[in-house]
Structure formats: structure tokens, C-alpha cells
Amino acid sequence: MLSCWVLLLALLGGVCALPAPLSYPQALIQAVDSYNQRPEVQNAFRLLSADPEPGPGVDLSTLRALNFTIMETECTPSARLPVDDCDFKENGVIRDCSGPVSVLQDTPEINLRCRDASSDPVLVQRGRFGRFLRKIRRFRPKVTITIQGSARFG
């Protein structure tokens, strides 16, 4: 009899433990990943900005659409690297993307449309490796070489 109660409580506990709803940053990541899986994408794209920016007060359920900008990186989509570890490609393609969001059974359904925005000026943030190299350059010792000499002929 006791084992029946334990089994019943375990089943009810499993039913009540539903997965957490999808967050806004997770929806942005999934949207960029789905764009990178398109066959025409040569180099992977990375999130450049989002409107609104991800933050504590932004909830996916209150948004009707995702609006974000992505930029081409130096990595290929087939590389198994996280896109955040890839540096932006110099003079890479920039795309403005938007699309309505509907959440069905904790899975976002996004009809994504992207347009070329490469002509718009943008400040490019380097990846982790680029930031590491910049820090090394900042702290390296300054070396000055001075060459002095004289020559006498005959």
C-alpha cells in the first residue's frame, strides 16, 4: 500500500515538473542559430544588437516580434565552435532581422525575415581572442632602438 502512494506521488511530481518557459535571450540565440542553418549562409552570423536589449525586465511573452541585427563572422556554420567565440569578419555582411514570435508548447515559432543592412555604419566588437590580443598589446613593454654610428673612409 505504501509503495502505491510513493508511486502516485512520483507520477504527480513528474507531471508538475514542467520545463521552464523560454527566455528572451534563449529565443534570440535560437533565432540566430536557425538563420545560420540556412543553406545560403557561407559564414556564421553572430548577434550584434537586439531591440529591446536583453535584460531583467524583458519577457518573451510580452513581445510580439523579435527585432535584432546580426553580423557575419570569420567562422563557418559547419565549425563546431560557439558563435560567441568567433570574431566578426572585417567588412562582414550585416543583416537586420525581424519576425513574429508565437510560443507553442515551450518551442518558439519564428517566421524570420532578414534584410541587408551592410551600408549602415556599425561599431564592431571583437571576439574573446581579439580582446585578449588587445590586452597583451596594452601591457607589453615599449622598446626603443637607437642606432648611432660613424664611418671614415680613407
Curated annotation (Swiss-Prot):
Query: SUPFAM superfamilies, alphabetically?
Result: Cystatin/monellin
The cross-references to Gene3D superfamilies, in alphabetical order and at most eight, read: 3.10.450.10
Propeptide cleavage-removed residue intervals: 18-122
| Keywords assigned by UniProt, alphabetized | Antibiotic, Antimicrobial, Disulfide bond, Immunity, Innate immunity, Secreted, Signal
Q: Which GO biological-process labels does this protein carry? A: antibacterial innate immune response; antimicrobial humoral immune response mediated by antimicrobial peptide; defense response to Gram-negative bacterium; defense response to Gram-positive bacterium; innate immune response; macrophage activation
**Disulfide topology:** C75-C86, C97-C114
Where does the secretion signal sit in this chain? 1-17
Q: Where in the cell is it found?
A: Secreted
- UniProt entry tagged with the keyword Heme: no
Q: Which GO terms describe its molecular function?
A: lipopolysaccharide binding
What GO CC annotations are associated with the protein?
extracellular space
> What InterPro entries does this protein's entry cite?
Cathelicidin-like, Cystatin_sf
Q: Could you tell me in which tissues this protein is expressed?
A: Detected in trachea, lung, proventriculus, duodenum, jejunum, ileum, caeca, colon, caecal tonsil, bursa of Fabricius, kidney, ovary, testis, thymus, liver, spleen, bone marrow, skin, uropygial gland, muscle and brain.
User: What does the function comment of this entry state?
Assistant: Binds bacterial lipopolysaccharide (LPS). Has potent antimicrobial activity against Gram-positive and Gram-negative bacteria (in vitro). Has hemolytic activity (in vitro). May play a role in the innate immune response.
Query: Which family would the database say this protein is a member of?
Result: Belongs to the cathelicidin family.
Q: What is this protein called?
A: Cathelicidin-2
